[in-house]
Amino acid sequence: KRSSRDIGTRINQIIPEGEFVGNLNDLPKARFNFVPHREVGLMTAVYLDEEFGMPCISTTPAGIIDTAECIRQMQERVGKWASAPPKEKVDHEPYIDQHTRSV
């Protein structure tokens, strides 16, 4: 949650954390699905990709390398949807550098 907030990504829903069945209608509004634990939720994320074309990030942000890769994948997914000109797009490499040095 913290990394998503820090890089400016708004979380649509966290399933099943405090969600209700009625909120499932909002799932297709997400730009991508983030599945930090492949054993929980990956099948659903694959289904949403097949049905709604919603890509999935399943890199577990644990350790320096995978945390950096996960953030880069988020940046790439958000960048594909961003309407800002390329010169205004956000570069998260300084954030990645700062947080992987302090681990």
UniProtKB/Swiss-Prot annotation:
Domain of life of the native organism: Eukaryota
Keywords: 4Fe-4S, ATP-binding, Chlorophyll biosynthesis, Chloroplast, Iron, Iron-sulfur, Metal-binding, Nucleotide-binding, Oxidoreductase, Photosynthesis, Plastid
Species, as recorded: Selaginella mollis
Compartment(s) where it occurs, according to its Swiss-Prot or TrEMBL record: Plastid, Chloroplast
Annotated Gene3D superfamilies: Nitrogenase molybdenum iron protein domain
Function: Component of the dark-operative protochlorophyllide reductase (DPOR) that uses Mg-ATP and reduced ferredoxin to reduce ring D of protochlorophyllide (Pchlide) to form chlorophyllide a (Chlide). This reaction is light-independent. The NB-protein (ChlN-ChlB) is the catalytic component of the complex.
Cellular component aspect of the GO annotation: chloroplast
Location (main, coarse): plastid
Cofactor(s) needed: [4Fe-4S] cluster
InterPro entries reported in the protein's UniProt record: ChlB/BchB/BchZ, Nase/OxRdtase_comp1
Subunit structure, as described in the record: Protochlorophyllide reductase is composed of three subunits; ChlL, ChlN and ChlB. Forms a heterotetramer of two ChlB and two ChlN subunits.
Pathway: Porphyrin-containing compound metabolism; chlorophyll biosynthesis (light-independent)
UniProt feature, compositional bias: Basic and acidic residues: 86-103
Gene: chlB
SUPFAM superfamilies recorded: Helical backbone' metal receptor (SSF53807)
The name this protein goes by in its record: Light-independent protochlorophyllide reductase subunit B
EC number: 1.3.7.7
Example GO molecular function: ATP binding
Similarity annotation: Belongs to the ChlB/BchB/BchZ family.
Gene Ontology biological process terms in this record: light-independent chlorophyll biosynthetic process; photosynthesis
Top-level enzyme category: oxidoreductase
Organism ancestry: Eukaryota, Viridiplantae, Streptophyta, Embryophyta, Tracheophyta
Region (Disordered): 81-103
Catalysis: reaction(s): chlorophyllide a + oxidized 2[4Fe-4S]-[ferredoxin] + 2 ADP + 2 phosphate = protochlorophyllide a + reduced 2[4Fe-4S]-[ferredoxin] + 2 ATP + 2 H2O
Comment on bound cofactor: Binds 1 [4Fe-4S] cluster per heterodimer. The cluster is bound at the heterodimer interface by residues from both subunits.
